[in-house]
Amino acid sequence: MRDMISVASGFQYSVNIGYDLGSDNKLKSFIPTKSALSLLEDILLSVNPTSSDRARVLIGAYGKGKSHIVLTILSILMKRDLTLFEKLMPKIEENPRLYQLIQNYYESENKILPVVISGSNTSLTQAFLLSLQLSLIHISEPTRRVVI
């Protein structure tokens, strides 16, 4: 059986958004689905300063890639180098509207501050404030990596 079935090299078993935010390998290994491309397009449309439709709820079974798509979209919003999205960019290039949205976003002066909220025994408000503080510390000290 092992001769017929094997795990692809580089296959990642899990994604932790806070820990993997700077991981190039996670971005390179993301395999986009039609629904992932649709979500990316929706989010790119929602970052327009005039947009009021910004909230999203992502529901799916364990292991379906929710964290991986969020990590990938967040990395695009952070304007990471597009060459890191090895498997994603060919699919995006097949969709002229999505490709143009990404090009326009990368050429814009829009900036996104990632605030990754981790579960804790504090209130949601406290968890948000702590995560916001850590994100602000991270951007003010570019040589320091803060894992939330």
Question: Where are the language model's segments positioned?
Answer:
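Conserved phosphate-binding/catalytic loops and adjacent sensor/switch elements of nucleotide-binding enzymes
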Residues: 115-133
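Single conserved hydrophobic/aromatic residue that forms the stacking wall/gate
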Residues: 137-148
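Charged, alpha-helix-enriched surfaces in structured cytosolic catalytic cores
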Residues: 57, 68, 123, 127
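Short, mixed-charge aromatic SLiMs
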Residues: 96-99
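Conserved catalytic segments around the Walker B and adjacent sensor/switch elements
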Residues: 56-57, 83-90, 101-120
